[in-house]
A protein has these predicted regions:
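Conserved acetyl-CoA binding element of GNAT-fold acetyltransferases
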Residues: 11-26, 72, 168-179, 210
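Conserved GNAT acetyl-CoA-binding A-motif
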Residues: 41-52, 199-211
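Conserved acetyl-CoA-binding loop-helix of GNAT-fold acetyltransferases
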Residues: 28-37, 174-179, 183-198, 220-224
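Active-site rim helix/loop that mediates acceptor-substrate recognition in acyltransferases
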Residues: 54-59, 123-146
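Conserved active-site alpha-helix within GNAT-family acetyltransferase domains
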Residues: 53-67, 188, 213-231
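Short amphipathic alpha-helix that is part of the acyltransferase structural core
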Residues: 18-23, 85-125
Length: 241
């Protein structure tokens, strides 16, 4: 049984052969098979995902891994009645100027991504990926839509969400604020829009938000906004051929 799964979308978008391996128990992980599959399938890059705990240093060396990110998913219980009065406007259409502003914010947000630090992917491809997330929110192929906040006619922040009505979970997929409008409460306004949307347009009971642990401001902001539970800690490594 293969231990590396080929990621078709990532491979196509980034133009290199990319795989992923979920490493649940390093003691039972077959290092020789892992390295054999990399060579046999000519993977240029493999994401290795480890949950809860870091890999031992010796295992990192055996697998030729580099730790690229520590991703935390926090959650909060959601009560619709507390947010029904909030004003919201989930958009699937933006003006050309709004789209360009949103692209710029998304591209600026890309600098914190692990892909941005990965030389096999590069800065421009990472910026293209974050622009794609805006497109995929507007066409509803991944996210539900885009919330924006404007200051003096200019988009100052964007916020993308995804709703799972079956599991009754709302997910944050991207939040970005223009650097010129930091510390003006834009992020809070964006998140409150999504609270209002979910309170009136869904039956969700939980909101989950993944973010990079490297972003200490984001951690503090989550706590401030009521996220009080850590759902998951994910250590993301890259193995390069």
């Amino acid at each position: 049984m293969a231990i590396i799964e080929k990621l078709e979308w990532d491979s196509s978008f980034f133009g290199i052969n990319i795989g992923r391996s979920i490493l649940r128990d390093e003691k039972e992980f077959d290092t020789r098979l892992f390295n054999k599959e990399i060579k046999a399938n000519r993977f240029d890059l493999v994401y290795v995902i480890k949950f809860q705990n870091l890999l031992p240093w010796a295992k990192m060396l055996d697998l030729n891994l580099q730790l690229m990110d520590i991703q935390i998913t926090m959650s909060m219980d959601f009560t619709s009645n507390s947010h029904k009065g909030l004003i919201y406007n989930l958009k699937n259409n933006l003006t050309v100027e709004e789209i360009n502003d949103s692209y710029k914010i998304a591209e600026d947000t890309a600098v914190v991504s692990r892909f941005y630090k990965e030389n096999k992917i590069g800065n421009q491809k990472t910026r293209d990926l974050y622009r794609k997330w805006i497109d995929n929110a507007l066409n509803k192929s991944f996210s539900d839509g885009v919330f924006i906040e404007k200051v003096s006619g200019k988009v100052a922040g964007v916020h993308l969400i995804k709703t799972d009505n079956i599991k009754k979970i709302g997910m944050f997929t991207l939040t970005g604020v223009d650097g010129n409008f930091k510390r003006m409460g834009i992020g809070r306004k964006l998140w409150l829009q999504s609270f209002g949307f979910w309170a009136n347009e869904s039956d969700i009971e939980t909101i989950k938000s993944p973010f990079s642990f490297q972003n200490s401001e984001s951690l503090n902001f989550h706590l401030k906004m009521g996220f009080n539970k850590i759902e998951e800690i994910k250590y993301i490594y890259h193995s390069k051929n």
